[in-house]
Amino acid sequence: MITLSKSQEEVFKKLAVELSMSKLIEACNKSVDFSSLNSNEQLDVLKVTNAFYRSAEQIINDSTYDAFLSEFSTYNPDHPYLLTVEPEVLADSKTVPLPKKMLSTDKAYSFEEIKKWIDRLLKAAIEVGVSESEIQIKVTPKLDGYAAYDDGISLYTRGDGARGQDITRAFNKGLQVANNGDRGLGPGEIVIKKSYFDTVLSDKFENSRNIQAAIIAEKKVDESIQKAIDVGACVFFPFLSLENWIGHYTEILVDFESIVEKMWSAVDYDIDGVVLEVTNETLKEHMGATRHHHRWQIAFKVNAESAEVKVLNVTPQTSRTGRVTPVAELEPTKLSGATISRATVHHYNMVKTNGVGPGAIVQLVRSGLVIPKIEKVIKAVEPQLAKECPSCGTHLIWESDHLVCPNKTDCPAQTENTLVHFFKTLGNNDGFGPKVIEKLHEFGIKKIHEIYELKQESFVSFGFGDKTAQNLVEQLQVSRDVEIEDWRFLAAFGVSRLAGGNCEKLLQHHSLDSLFEATVEDLVQLDGFAQVSADAIVEGLANIKEEFLKLSALNFNLTITPKASEKSPGETPVFGKIIVFTGAMTQGSRGDMEKQAKALGAKVAKSVTGKTSLLVTGDKVGANKINAARDKGVQVLSELDYLALISTY
């Protein structure tokens, strides 16, 4: 039952909202449905609960606030409260302009919303001629601390995003930058290590926000908080210094949950989601921002429920790469409408250091992610470590935080997961999931090319029905006939450090066949490939070469990645230019002309902007479109004039 403390009552009175205190309490206790309140009452609930949160007097959890906010935005999508940074309620001291605006972050609560955001990125990339191969996404933990900006001289609160309060006194109290970092790295958050809070301060403080508020307050801090500052448990963590994952946008689409899980476990601080942002500066500039948030960035948040659960057993599972993942078998527990009986532990070093084994009590969280997650260990026991691969029985070895099966050739789990990965990455077929692959492996199928050699009667002899067997044979043909990119075909082989984005980069400089002759020295000369990656890629390519050649002989319908121009800027008249093709072309398809332009070093966009260099017009192009382009300073050429321009290249 939620009630207001005296300090919360004081905050409530200062806000002078029309909402009654009793109705606020009813809404927070959910004894009255938030949706039954009128818009003004809903807004007051949001204002008050936000004020409590920012004053270290949190009255409802984040997921409840987000649910209220979502309900309000459904019927008031253009309300100013939603279009600006949520107001900060801190003491009555004066505000000063921030060195740089600190906007809020747009939020997503499902994978579908993330996919829509990526669609917007792709559309924007076309508009400014950014190649899909250049669209990299950075993912970082979304810290749940106190937002601030450090310009190297002063520290400021976020305030309303444009003006904040000077809280440099926090550094004067001894607050350090995380990881002994430098001052002046811009936006970040004041946070406290979860492990320190849980073991040292949780008995004295209800939550870490109380401590963060004390650090920025004008008065002297409590002795226990000062100690936390002195030992580096309380820090200012610049976003630039955060652990991060960077990869091609297609990897987000294929492996979203595991990337989120990795970032969720990357820091020893409270987090309430992950932040995704595009790294291409041209794309960032083009997408811009609203008054509330940057369009090139989004936070994936989860409305989570948790429970304390007993561990019954820790079961090892071997992945495609040989890493063995620990899975905690749990006492069946109802959480977020589902009965949970197992959850993945990030890696075996976590099992070892946190004491996860039979009898351990863990805090289990289930949220918008399908996969339940162990948030922390409440009661540690003797850790249960695997000694042998559960699939092939090979003795496991340690590689950093992971236990690994070194049996790369005869481990059933590695073989089956490799086969599944191939068909999943191609993405142009249906039917070859884990169960089908497992059955094929039982009958001795270990290589991808062996699957393509199977006839309908072979599938029937393995126990598949006639219709299923016929469908599988048809799907194998479909996977060869339906056009796919050559970089996606290469990525399907699962070479370490060679996911979709890196595959496309390499194929801009090497053909599929010549790539296998590339040396480590060749790769490190290319932008984005360090020594460690190059070593792993060259070794991985050597390992798959025989299998690759057998599959290549099956004549998959591959779209060839255009090669990066080897000509200098002076050798081609369109090098570096942004070109838009419009109208019906008579000398070839528009697609062919776009590919040719890219091969000559140009960037191709779909619509004219102020950054467009050249508009090439075919038949049936309106005068208004041509005049609008010229008004923007864009050069306009007919199809024939353009072909004459590039005719010697």
From Swiss-Prot:
Keywords: DNA damage, DNA repair, DNA replication, Ligase, Magnesium, Manganese, Metal-binding, NAD, Zinc. It catalyses: NAD(+) + (deoxyribonucleotide)n-3'-hydroxyl + 5'-phospho-(deoxyribonucleotide)m = (deoxyribonucleotide)n+m + AMP + beta-nicotinamide D-nucleotide. Zn(2+) binds at residues 389, 392, 405, 411. SMART domains: BRCT, LIGANc. Transmembrane segments: none annotated. NAD(+) binds at residues 62-66, 104-105, 158, 189, 301. Residues 569-649 form the BRCT domain. PROSITE patterns: BRCT (PS50172). GO terms for molecular function: DNA ligase (NAD+) activity; metal ion binding. Its EC number is 6.5.1.2. It is an enzyme of class 6 (ligase). Its cofactor is Mg(2+); Mn(2+). GO terms for biological process: DNA repair; DNA replication. InterPro entries: BRCT_dom (IPR001357), BRCT_dom_sf (IPR036420), DNA_ligase (IPR001679), DNAligase_adenylation (IPR013839), DNAligase_N (IPR013840), NA-bd_OB-fold (IPR012340), NAD_DNA_ligase_OB (IPR004150), RuvA_2-like (IPR010994). Gene3D superfamilies: 5' to 3' exonuclease, C-terminal subdomain, BRCT domain, DNA ligase/mRNA capping enzyme, Nucleic acid-binding proteins. It comes from the Bacteria. DNA ligase that catalyzes the formation of phosphodiester linkages between 5'-phosphoryl and 3'-hydroxyl groups in double-stranded DNA using NAD as a coenzyme and as the energy source for the reaction. It is essential for DNA replication and repair of damaged DNA. Belongs to the NAD-dependent DNA ligase family. LigA subfamily. This is DNA ligase.
